[in-house]
């Protein structure tokens, strides 16, 4: 958990500003709120409300919440659409588009019934807009370029203003050149808290987005015309081991909210606990309509809020259950080499195809073994397909994977990583002695003249 300061810039005078739809007061046109940005890619502490009505803030996984100012009873925010550099995990950065220095953009938090005003400045090389996904707003504030508003041209600032009518979890993203801009990372979350602070209370409340990119090994910019063959599946534009853990106290009531802005569905699975889906795009789920789950599927454009009691201490995996979504970019679309003696084959092929990354002789787990990796130098700005280590060795995961760390005795606002879980004596799976004969593998018969083999540079992944 990083608590470093955000950068702040002076107020920008309201000159040459476009208005998104309705009439606004002279007070609103006097000045635009200051721009607040951050380049931090670690989870920030929850932003406690200092003005406006009280609420229990969320924690954005590997992200932050946008500060606001009160102006005559209206909550004002300033979003800046701009190119950003996002560290996806240590050793890899991506050149994306986002908001206020990051992709995804900052979380916006308001209270049910708030009058909200959002200034949007466009520092992109092309026009844009913002659609407030799932929210009941006036038609002229819906953010669909050409249909409900003029486009926000480069260098211009527009203003959106509406009432936050319904409590829930929402998303924001462009409805202008949507394929390019969303493939480049332009999205964020919006939380409208209940006006009754005692409604459905939880002790810890996390939120993040599911997004995906296609970035070739050695490159930095996503391929925006990719339809399904993405090779980086992320939580808030981070891949494991770059995704922070969600740290909670034992017996906390925990809520985790996530929205899906990828091009496919994701079955999200929590180990060690049962949960209930308590919120969807349409609002809160009545208690009589809930049932226990350990996995919930979230479709494209949907969000889900799940809740559970953290009564089982430990380091619990939390991930998408599509196995290819818990891998990083390396090793996709390469031949299956199980059982094939490779010896110096990797080095020889690497001289011809520098970005070639094979499957190991015994499986993909070799990708996380450092002795094997010594013979497989990584291309620039690339991370291994599966990586990360725990107290017992390689975790063999990547992509959409993190942990929920449950501990006794944490302070109320303590979100620091507590380190590895200390298992009670006798509660860890262990090796036992057996007298079974060793497993013999069937011998592979190589035809006369050798085996035919083709080599391809990895470009994306299988369609999933």
Q: What residues fall within each predicted segment?
A:
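Copper-binding active sites and cupredoxin-like electron-transfer domains
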Residues: 2-464
């Amino acid at each position: 958990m990083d608590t470093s300061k955000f950068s702040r810039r002076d107020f920008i005078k309201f000159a040459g500003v476009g208005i998104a739809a309705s009439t606004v007061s002279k007070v609103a046109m006097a000045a635009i709120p200051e721009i607040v940005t951050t380049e931090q890619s670690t989870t920030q502490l929850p932003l406690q409300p200092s003005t406006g009505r009280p609420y229990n803030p969320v924690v954005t996984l590997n992200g932050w919440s946008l500060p606001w100012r009160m102006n005559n009873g209206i909550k004002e925010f300033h979003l800046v659409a701009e190119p950003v550099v996002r560290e996806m995990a240590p050793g890899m950065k991506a050149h994306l588009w986002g908001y206020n220095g990051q992709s995804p953009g900052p979380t916006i938090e308001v209270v049910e019934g708030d009058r909200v005003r959002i200034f949007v400045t466009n520092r992109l090389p092309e026009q844009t807009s913002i659609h407030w996904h799932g929210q009941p707003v006036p038609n002229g504030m819906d953010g669909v370029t050409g249909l409900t508003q003029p486009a926000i041209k480069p260098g211009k600032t527009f203003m959106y203003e509406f009432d936050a009518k319904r409590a829930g979890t929402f998303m924001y993203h462009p409805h202008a050149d949507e394929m390019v801009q969303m493939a480049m990372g332009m999205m964020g979350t919006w939380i409208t808290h209940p006006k009754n602070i005692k409604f459905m209370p939880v002790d810890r409340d996390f939120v993040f987005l599911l997004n995906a990119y296609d970035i070739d090994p050695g490159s930095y910019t996503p391929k925006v015309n990719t339809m399904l063959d993405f090779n980086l599946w992320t939580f808030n534009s981070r891949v494991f081991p770059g995704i922070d853990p969600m740290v909670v106290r034992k017996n906390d009531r925990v809520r985790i909210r996530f929205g899906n802005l990828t091009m496919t569905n994701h079955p999200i699975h929590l180990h060690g606990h049962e949960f209930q889906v308590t919120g969807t795009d349409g609002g809160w789920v009545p208690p009589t309509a809930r049932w226990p789950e350990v996995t919930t599927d979230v479709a494209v454009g949907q969000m889900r809020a799940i809740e559970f009691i953290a009564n089982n201490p430990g380091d619990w995996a939390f991930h998408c259950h599509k196995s290819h979504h818990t891998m990083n970019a390396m090793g996709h679309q390469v031949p299956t080499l199980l059982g094939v003696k490779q010896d110096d084959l990797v080095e020889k092929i690497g001289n011809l195809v520098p970005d070639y990354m094979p499957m190991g002789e015994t499986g993909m787990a070799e990708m996380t073994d450092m002795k094997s990796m010594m013979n497989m130098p990584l291309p620039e700005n690339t991370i291994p397909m599966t990586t990360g280590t725990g107290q017992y060795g390689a975790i063999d995961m990547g992509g959409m994977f993190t942990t929920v760390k449950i501990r006794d005795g944490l302070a109320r606002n303590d979100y620091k990583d507590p380190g590895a879980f200390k298992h009670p004596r006798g509660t860890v799976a262990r090796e036992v002695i057996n007298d079974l004969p060793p497993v013999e593998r069937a011998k592979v018969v190589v035809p006369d003249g050798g085996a035919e083999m083709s080599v391809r540079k990895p470009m994306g992944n299988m369609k999933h």
